[in-house]
């Protein structure tokens, strides 16, 4: 769930999709400039209070984003930063979520612009970790640029609690992020002209989980939209083994970096969870540092992780461990059968989301009867090739059948 590698991987989208998608929407192959993920400076202020309408997807506020992102503006796209209404996956209360939408230059295809909602990887759990607060979208400008140049209205949601929507971020709670993805599509299609109802959910790591959840929720929550498919790259489908690894002292180094986020997120789902009940002396002393955005003070974080004991995040009692497992167990995917095609790719050498965890999720989805295309990549870690995924995406937008690998 490392957000730093995500934008690099996303940059490859255009090269693969260009040939198959241009026939669909009319576009030219995008260039491939070098990648930078250095966050631009930003300032944050208290989130404004919004008057909710009771209609998820309603745009509550919007502003021009083109003058903030010169690289995206150079593509000719029209850019908006907006806040839209969504729904908490924890208590079903209305929430406000911020995002960016990019509308391609030129004439929309027959039937209107199709939409890609792109779920970003882990950026943190604090409000100022929202990509749309930064001109370069914390590096995700390249994914937005690629999909937009291919003829898709592209929407990048921050997720609840990140950016300027307000509230807290229930990190890796999939119903919330799934709702946020669906309502991002709904907001774009209700507020922008010349829109099709057809859309796809695409994401990597945390965003891969969000895309999977959006697929499962589409039938009951996504009324009025036509989800053609979802793409999940390195998605965390079951986090209970992560809790067990913490108990056993078997966490990998990058997993240790994520545990403070996970504990914070679990506390947003169950306020009786105290992250300090799962934190050793080093984690407790460095808690504020470890909860900063994923690109912040990397040297300090590395030193803290290096000093951690193997069982740094073991629960202080069997009762505490079970309490956390009860919450994290609710995150496990799949949860329901879906009839919408889904692509899942994961690396056999992934040391963050271990490959067996994803393989088990795929096996369960197959048992439910999901139309799933899964690909384990033997030489890849958390960064996986997206070539087959993008071919899948072009096919489902073209209305072609995609054989399941189950």
Where are these regions (language model features)?
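Secretory targeting and sorting signals
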Residues: 1-31
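Catalytic-loop region of hydrolases
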Residues: 28-108, 366
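Accessory cap/linker subdomain of secreted extracellular hydrolases
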Residues: 47-50, 69, 235-334
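Short, surface-exposed "cap/lid" segments of acyl-processing enzymes
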Residues: 89-98, 102-150
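Alpha/beta-hydrolase active-site loop
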Residues: 171-192
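Primarily recognizes the serine-hydrolase "nucleophile elbow" in alpha/beta-hydrolase
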Residues: 186-255
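C-terminal catalytic histidine-bearing segment of alpha/beta-hydrolase fold enzymes
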Residues: 316, 321, 325-326, 352, ...
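Short beta-strand/loop motif that positions the catalytic acidic residue
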Residues: 338, 343-350
